[in-house]
């Protein structure tokens, strides 16, 4: 029987692999190897990030639109690149299961995110007119987030193998556990997920079809 790390690699390369199953198997491996930071990342992907820092790969960009009483939803033109970044980019802290459901149940290629009340009030003040605002974006951006999670798992599993960690059935030798603790490319692996820190808004996504 192949080691569990090799199993994980094979499953992560399968385009039809269940992402939650991949996360559970990754959590099992991380727990066995005593890699708490990677465990925490997996739990955040499973349960959502909440108030914790959300990785850069969960960034989406859309088009900000305002509700015009006569013309309906119209694009909002920004006066500066800074304002455009602030109002058209956001990070999605939702769990992967929520994101997957949103992607699967989308009735069109576009999704809509209504702005929270306080955020809407702030945008209205900046734009100079009081109305309802929303962000429209392609559902392919949700797919990109899910794909990135799978790629992270695959790359992590390859890093383990390259370091001599493959497991025997569903257990690891003391030598493999020692390697996992001593190699910084393993213990610090999740630093690859964050990239350059930004001050972009983080917003929970609930689906509206257009």
Predicted features and spans:
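Internal, Lys/Arg-enriched amphipathic helical interaction segments that engage polyanionic partners
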Residues: 77-190, 194-196
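Surface-exposed polar/charged interaction patches
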Residues: 11-15, 29, 48, 102-106, ...
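The right-handed parallel beta-helix/beta-solenoid scaffold, focusing on the short coil/turn
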Residues: 198-200
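Membrane-interacting alpha-helical segments
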Residues: 1-10
């Amino acid at each position: 029987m192949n080691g569990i790390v090799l199993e994980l690699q094979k499953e992560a390369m399968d385009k039809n692999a269940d992402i939650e199953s991949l996360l559970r198997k990754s959590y099992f491996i991380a727990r066995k190897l005593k890699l708490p930071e990677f465990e925490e990342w997996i739990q955040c992907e499973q349960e959502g990030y909440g108030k914790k820092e959300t990785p850069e790969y969960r960034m989406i960009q859309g088009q900000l639109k305002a509700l015009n009483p006569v013309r309906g939803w119209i694009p909002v033109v920004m006066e500066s690149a800074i304002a455009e970044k602030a109002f058209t980019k956001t990070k999605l802290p939702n769990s992967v299961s929520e994101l997957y459901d949103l992607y699967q149940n989308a009735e069109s290629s576009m999704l809509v995110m209504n702005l929270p009340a306080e955020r809407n009030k702030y945008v209205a003040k900046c734009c100079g007119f009081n109305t309802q605002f929303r962000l429209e974006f392609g559902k392919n951006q949700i797919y990109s987030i899910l794909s990135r999670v799978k790629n992270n798992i695959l790359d992590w599993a390859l890093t383990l193998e390259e370091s001599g960690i493959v497991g025997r059935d569903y257990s690891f030798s003391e030598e493999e556990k020692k390697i996992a603790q001593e190699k910084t490319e393993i213990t610090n692996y999740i630093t690859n997920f964050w990239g350059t820190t930004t001050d972009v808004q983080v917003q929970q996504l609930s689906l509206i079809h257009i």
